[in-house]
Amino acid sequence: MALRMPFNQAFWEEYLSGQDATLPSLPDTSTLTSRVIRILGGNPGAMHLQGTNTYLVGTGPSRILIDTGQGLPIWLSRIVGVLQSNNISISHILLTHWHGDHTGGVPDLISYNPTLAEHVYKNLPDLGQKPIEDGQIFAVEGATVRAVFTPGHSVDHMCFLLEEENALFTGDNVLGHGFSVAPDLGRYMESLELMAKLGCVIGYPAHGAVIDDLPSKLEEYIRHKEMRVQGILSVLVKERERVEGERGKEGRRKGGMTLHEIARAMFGTVPDEVIDQAMAPFLMQALWKLTEDGKVGFEPGDPVKRKWFAVARRKTRPSIRRQHGSVTSR
């Protein structure tokens, strides 16, 4: 059984509802290129944009399927229609990660074609699934798909690189509209950097329209997260400077702010329930990342009342080394 991290629906809704509400309409099924067909999951909403994108990949009679939607009957009807009208079948089912809007259609597909039970792949597989290794290749006629381990949005998240198109199926790491969320911000930002280094031009996201300029989108994502993290650090640095200024030379106290105080310093008057349900997940992950980076510390105790503080920068001193009985600096 795969290790799973908590999934905060309210946090998703806070992020996505704040983005452009006028999303472009997407067809239920679309032939995007000669080797990629997109089938919408039939589950539009604040969390899923126009719905979960699922993709049939390849050019021959046997295709790779990436993700399976939420498990709604309308999706099964759509994909069966595509399979039958094109006289094609599914060779592999590749799941980007464990969230139900990506894995929910697996049982329906197996009911439709029981032989598919032996061909379901996921990183950190659940019972009955086969593992996906970083760098593993899945190939059918017209398509070579390479798995790329990109955790952060979820502990098991995989992207898939389509070599023939220099395109990347980005899963939930990068969306077609707005920004995604990440319970593990540090690993997520590392994954974004890794995705950028792949050099893919096109992005096929799990939600939203095709990304025509993936490098620019990744740069935007990385900059957005860095600005959020830097904003939190700036608030804590100002608090430390305020405390030290008030206490003068005796200002040994670090200064500190609770999660709620940080949120209000950044966003103004915000109700406690909004902070707890919508802002706390990102703030906590950003604070832990800053802690891992050595820029922020905290006082042990009740997480709600815990004080976070900016770590003072240490003045660098010349390094000292001994040479032939003398002491030199450099």
Curated annotation (Swiss-Prot):
State a single Gene Ontology molecular function: metal ion binding
Residues given in the record as Zn(2+) 2 binding sites = D101, H102
- SMART domains on file: Lactamase_B
> What cofactor requirement does the entry state?
Zn(2+)
Q: Where are the catalytic residues?
A: D101
Question: Which pathway does the UniProt entry assign to this protein?
Answer: Secondary metabolite biosynthesis
For this chain's record, the cofactor binding note is: Binds 2 Zn(2+) ions per subunit.
Q: Name any Gene Ontology BP term.
A: secondary metabolite biosynthetic process
Q: Provide the residue positions that the database annotates as binding Zn(2+) 1.
A: H97, H99
Asked if the Swiss-Prot or TrEMBL record annotates the protein with the keyword NADP, the reply is no
Cited Pfam families: Lactamase_B
InterPro entries on file: LACTB2-like_MBL-fold, Metallo-B-lactamas, RibonucZ/Hydroxyglut_hydro, Sec-metab_biosynth-thioest, WH-like_DNA-bd_sf
- Entry keyword set: Hydrolase, Metal-binding, Zinc
Q: CDD domains annotated for this entry?
A: LACTB2-like_MBL-fold (cd07722)
Question: What EC number is given for this enzyme?
Answer: 3.1.-.-
- Protein task: Lactamase-like protein; part of the gene cluster that mediates the biosynthesis of neosartoricin, a prenylated anthracenone that exhibits T-cell antiproliferative activity, suggestive of a physiological role as an immunosuppressive agent. The non-reducing polyketide synthase nscA probably synthesizes and cyclizes the decaketide backbone. The hydrolase nscB then mediates the product release through hydrolysis followed by spontaneous decarboxylation. The prenyltransferase nscD catalyzes the addition of the dimethylallyl group to the aromatic C5.
The UniProt family comment states: Belongs to the metallo-beta-lactamase superfamily.
Q: What is the protein name stated in its UniProt record?
A: Lactamase-like protein nscB
Source organism of this protein record: Aspergillus fumigatus (strain ATCC MYA-4609 / CBS 101355 / FGSC A1100 / Af293)
Q: What is the lineage of its organism?
A: Eukaryota, Fungi, Dikarya, Ascomycota, Pezizomycotina
The gene coding this protein: nscB
